[in-house]
Design a protein with these regions (language model features):
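Compositionally biased, low-complexity segments enriched in small residues
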Residues: 51-54, 277, 286, 290
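Short, glycine/acidic-rich hinge or "gate" loops at secondary-structure transitions
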Residues: 22, 264-272
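Intrinsic, low-complexity terminal and presequence regions
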Residues: 258, 264, 276-278, 288
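Short, mixed-charge aromatic SLiMs
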Residues: 125-130, 277-283
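Conserved non-catalytic scaffold segment of RNase H-like nuclease domains
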Residues: 3-164
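Long, low-complexity, intrinsically disordered segments
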Residues: 281-302
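Compositionally biased non-globular segments, especially hydrophobic aliphatic-rich helices
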Residues: 60, 64-65, 272-274, 294-295
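Metal-dependent phosphoesterase core characteristic of DEDDh/y 3'-5' exonuclease domains
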Residues: 2, 98-125, 143-266
């Protein structure tokens, strides 16, 4: 049986896109009502005051406090807006509505190599839609041939993300994948997170690195939240990001083997555990304009 282990890496949409999707309710900020009202001297509590000078002084003090409080609310709203925007940006990569696919790593256990295909802006870009369509075609072929797809939270995250982003580009979801996702426990989608739950879904999410620590297998080499920052950073940082994706694929395969979900040949496991060679620092060759690369043309992990 053919086994394909995979993992996707996502990023927030560009800021100009996110700005059109971001919403903020400033009325929820404390004392927001001050911005919609004017100072009313009649609301100042004077008690038994009789002295006009003291009355005027108290009213002026109240007016000054109202003005300062109103200015403070404006500052609070701006601070709250910035914090909300930052949270929105930080979580954007987790939703197909606000995020995009940057890279997909996979490993066909019948072979000895892992691969990472990714969008690329150095020359003619491999676009997100090409990346998704090529991978879904490959996944569909594996399932159609009776094989299985393996990943961590692929039922709850990876596949829904890929399929929904694919819809944005007019990519028809493969029936093999849709039908598998519709099953309570699809036999051809091996999700290490679901398998770890043993039916207790109320237990919630378990991180891949937690399972790696538990089983004593390869650990994370970075933080997924930093993937897009490194990917769009220097050449060296991009290589680190792609190596991180590759490592996640190997981690998943090792954990699946530890859970007795698959049998991974020892020599392949050992080969994948070795660090990839340092990539040569050279520019990529110019691609023919508008040429859509196939899966086979996607970049190896270097």
């Amino acid at each position: 049986m053919q086994y394909l282990v995979f993992d996707i890496e996502t990023a927030p949409e560009p800021d100009d896109v996110l700005e059109g999707l971001f919403t903020f309710d400033e009325s929820a900020v404390k004392n927001y009502r001050l911005l919609t009202t004017d100072f009313d001297p009649g609301e100042v509590k004077l008690g038994n005051m009789k002295d006009p000078a003291k009355i005027e002084a108290k009213i002026e003090a109240a007016r000054l406090k109202f003005t300062m409080d109103k200015a403070a609310v404006t500052d609070q709203i701006e601070t709250a807006r910035m914090e909300s925007w930052q949270t929105f940006q930080d979580r954007a990569a987790l939703s197909p509505l606000t995020g995009r696919v940057l890279a997909i790593g996979w490993w066909n256990l019948d072979t000895s190599n892992t691969f990472v295909a990714h969008v690329d802006g150095e020359t003619e870009p491999i676009t997100e839609n090409v990346l998704i369509e090529n991978f879904l075609c490959m996944a569909d072929a594996v399932l159609s041939d009776g094989g299985s797809l393996i990943g961590h939270n692929i039922i709850g995250f990876d596949f829904p993300f890929l399929l929904r982003r694919g819809l944005k580009f007019g990519i028809r979801p493969p029936k093999t994948i849709v039908n598998a996702l519709a099953q309570y426990r699809p036999s051809n989608l091996i999700d290490t997170m679901r398998e770890w739950q043993f039916g207790n879904r109320a237990e919630g999410f378990v991180k891949l690195d937690q399972l790696a620590a538990f089983f004593g297998t390869q650990r994370k080499t970075g933080d997924g939240a930093d993937f897009h920052k490194k990917f769009f950073g220097t050449f060296e940082e991009r290589q680190e990001a792609l190596a991180y994706c590759r490592n996640d694929v190997v981690m998943t395969a090792e954990i699946a083997a530890k859970m007795r979900l698959i049998a991974m040949p020892a020599k392949q496991a050992a080969a994948q555990s070795e660090s990839p060679p340092e990539p040569p620092k050279q520019e990529e060759p110019q691609r023919e304009h508008n040429a859509a690369p196939t899966v086979a043309q996607q970049d190896d992990i270097y």
